[in-house]
Amino acid sequence: MAKMYRKLALCGGEGGQEWDDDVYEGVRKVYVGQDLNRITYIKFEYVQEDGEVVTTEYGTTNQHPKEFVIQYPDEHIIAVEGSYHQVALIATEVITSLVFKTSKGRKSPLFGPNLLGITTGTKFVFEDEGKKIVGFHGRAGDAVDALGVYFVLDTTPFPLYKLDAQGGTDGRVWDDGSYDGIKTLRIDQDNSRITYLEVEYEKDGEAKTCNHGGKGDTPSEFVLGYPDEYIKSVEATYQKPNIFSNTAITSLKFLTSKGRTSFFGYNVGKKFVLEQKGHRLVGFHGKEDAAIDALGAYFGPVPTPTPLIPSKKLPAIGGNEGVTWDDGVYDGVRKILVGQGNDGVSFVKFEYSKGKDLVPGDDHGKKTLLGAEEFVLEDGEYLMNIDGYYDKIFGVEEPIIVCLQFKTNKRESMPFGMDSGKKFSLGEEGHKIVGFHGQASDVVHSIGVTIVPITTTE
C-alpha cells in the first residue's frame, strides 16, 4: 500500500524563490542559521525508503548554523512552531523564529532572534494530532521567507497528496475525496466571486458529480479530454468582497497537461496555487456557503502508459544533493534548454514529444541572469548521447554538472559550460534518449537518461 500526504499551505512572506522538497521516510537533522533580524538559512537531512540520506538547503549562511538532531527512526518531528514578520529594509515578511517538536516530547532550541524567549511577529503552528512530518516546502532568497510542511496520513492504493484548502475560514467544510480523474468542470460567478463549483469525476469507469455553492442559471463549462488530459494546477485568488459576505474565492485558473488554460472570475485578492509537481489533480475539497469560500485539492500520480518498446533508465551521474526529479518516458526529445551560472550548469528543461503532442517538462535548477540557451531538434532527428563534466565547486558540498553537450543522429550541439572535472557520457549504441532524471537545487547536481531501442522506421 502507498501513503497519503497532507501538504499544509505556506506561512510567511511572498519574497524569494519557491522550493519544494516533497516527501521522504523521515527527517534526520535540521540546521538553522540566523542574523539579528530573521532566519537566514535552513538545511534538512532526509532519509529515503532505501536508507539513503538526501540533503537540501535554502537561504544564506551568515553565521555557523545550529543543529537539531532527531533520533531517526525511533523519533520524528510532529510539530513546527514559528513566527514571521516584516523587518527593516525588506519589502515582504520573512520567518523570524522556529521551534521543532518531536514524538519523544523534545523541543529544539528557539531558533531566531529573541529576547529571553520572546519573539515578535505573526505566530503559526504546523501540527496534526501527532502525525509525522516527512517533508518541507517554502520560499527563500537571502533568507527563509516562508515555510510549509508535509504530514504522512493513511495508507492508500497509490501515493496521494492532500493540499490544504486556502481562502476564507467561514462556511461549511466539504470533501469530495479522490478519484481516477476529472472529466468536466462547471463554474458560476456573480459580480465579485466564484459562487458555484460542479465537478464530474470518474472512478472505476463510473461517473460521479459533486457540486458546491449556489448554482446560477448558466454556469460555464470546461471539458477535459479525459483520460488523456488532466489538470496540472489551479491558480486562485480570494478576498472579502464586502462587509456582509464571507471571504471567498474570486478567481480560478486551470492548467491542463495539454497546455490549455481556462479562467473564471475576477483576478483580485490574495493569490495561491494548488499544484504538486509531477502529479495530476484527482479531487477537490474546501468550504462553501453562498459561494466557494475556500478550495483545496487531492493530487495523485500521472498514469504512465506501458511503452510498446521497453525503456531502460541509465543512472544519474554527478553529485548526490538537491531534490530528485524524473520527467518520465516519452516518444522523444524535441527541445533542450540549458542555463549556466558562474560555476556550472544551473538550470535544465526539456520538451518532449508524445504521439502528436508536445509535452513540456518541469524546470530543474534555477535560472540565473544569463538566461537559458536552446537546442532544438528537427523532424526526423533524435537524441542519442550526452557528454558532460561534473566537478566540485567552492561553497557546495557535492559535485555539480559543469558542462553538457548533446549528440543526435544528425549533429552535435555546442558545449554548454566548461570542460573541467570528471568527464562522463550517457547513452548506448542503437538506442535513443526519451527521458531525463537527476537531482537539482539552485544548480544541477546530477543528470541521467532513459533510453529505448531505435526502431527500423526511425
Swiss-Prot record:
Keywords: Lectin, Repeat. Disruption phenotype: Larger PYK10 complexes. One of its GO terms (molecular function) is carbohydrate binding. SMART domains: Jacalin. It comes from the Eukaryota. Pfam families: Jacalin. InterPro entries: Jacalin-like_lectin_dom, Jacalin-like_lectin_dom_plant, Jacalin-like_lectin_dom_sf. Residues 5-153, 160-301, 311-453 form the Jacalin-type lectin domain. Coiled coil: none annotated. SUPFAM superfamilies: Mannose-binding lectins. PANTHER family: JACALIN-RELATED LECTIN 3 (PTHR47293), JACALIN-TYPE LECTIN DOMAIN-CONTAINING PROTEIN (PTHR47293:SF27). Inhibitor-type lectin that may regulate the correct polymerization and activation of BGLU23/PYK10 upon tissue damage. Component of the PYK10 complex, at least composed of PYK10/BGLU23, BGLU21, BGLU22, JAL22, JAL23, PBP1/JAL30, PBP2/JAL31, JAL32, JAL33, JAL34, JAL35, GLL22 and GLL23. Belongs to the jacalin lectin family. This is Jacalin-related lectin 22. It comes from Arabidopsis thaliana (Mouse-ear cress).
